[in-house]
């Protein structure tokens, strides 16, 4: 079991993107930082907002890239390479079109599924895709042509409340994730109902 050393929350920078569906991963990391009572601060060296906390004697680093989504890998690779963090010790939280709002799932490895942030992370990590993902459901607009405006839009209140609940569920299983007990975390998280 590999303990998680880096948790990344994907999103786009700037106030115009705050609270958009595409920033679900960044919202997760913001909530995690708050729960751990640490402040995310800008760090130009890693092209993002960073923080650190300790869990069972191990450092866990938080990162929200401040590059745009399609350049997220630049930020992740800079921090991971500097601290010699292997892909299997990274958890990337991101929005997921293929899951309904209120559903969160953990996954290890796999492709990018059309997600530009994941695509760039895989490329910047030398085509290694063996990192863990926290997939936060945002739903799908029903037509591929509508996806861009959908993910860059704000969710209606009922949808946002479901996303918030899925983030709470994910935060609840985080101790198991941090310890590397993904089987237990997945059982608990995947049994939650939206």
Curated annotation (Swiss-Prot):
CDD domains: PTH. Its EC number is 3.1.1.29. It catalyses: an N-acyl-L-alpha-aminoacyl-tRNA + H2O = an N-acyl-L-amino acid + a tRNA + H(+). GO terms for cellular component: cytoplasm. GO terms for biological process: protein quality control for misfolded or incompletely synthesized proteins; rescue of stalled ribosome. The record marks 95 as: Stabilizes the basic form of H active site to accept a proton. The keyword tRNA-binding applies. The record marks 12 as: Discriminates between blocked and unblocked aminoacyl-tRNA. Keywords: Cytoplasm, Hydrolase, RNA-binding, tRNA-binding. Its main location: cytoplasm. TRNA binds at residues 17, 68, 70, 116. It is found in: Cytoplasm. The active site is at 22 (proton acceptor). Pfam families: Pept_tRNA_hydro. Monomer. Hydrolyzes ribosome-free peptidyl-tRNAs (with 1 or more amino acids incorporated), which drop off the ribosome during protein synthesis, or as a result of ribosome stalling. PANTHER family: PEPTIDYL-TRNA HYDROLASE. Belongs to the PTH family. NCBIfam families: pth. This is Peptidyl-tRNA hydrolase. It comes from Pseudomonas putida (strain ATCC 47054 / DSM 6125 / CFBP 8728 / NCIMB 11950 / KT2440).
């Amino acid at each position: 079991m590999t303990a998680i050393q880096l948790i990344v929350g994907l999103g786009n920078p700037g106030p115009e993107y705050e609270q958009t569906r595409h920033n679900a991963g960044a919202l997760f990391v913001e909530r995690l930082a708050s729960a751990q009572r640490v402040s995310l601060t800008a760090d130009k060296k890693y092209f993002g907002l960073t923080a650190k906390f300790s869990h069972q004697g191990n450092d866990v680093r938080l990162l929200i890239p401040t590059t745009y989504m399609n350049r997220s890998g630049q930020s992740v690779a800079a921090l991971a390479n500097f601290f010699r963090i292997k892909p299997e010790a990274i958890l990337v939280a991101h929005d997921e079109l293929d899951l309904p709002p209120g559903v969160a799932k953990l996954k290890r490895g796999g492709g990018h599924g059309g997600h530009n942030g994941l695509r760039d992370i895989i490329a910047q990590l030398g085509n290694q895709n063996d990192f863990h993902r926290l997939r936060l459901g945002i739903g799908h607009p029903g037509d591929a042509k509508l996806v861009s405006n959908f993910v860059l839009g704000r969710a209606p209140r009922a949808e946002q409340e479901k996303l918030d609940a899925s983030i709470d569920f994910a935060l609840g299983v985080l101790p198991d994730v941090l310890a590397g007990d993904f089987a237990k975390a997945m059982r608990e998280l995947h049994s939650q109902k939206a």
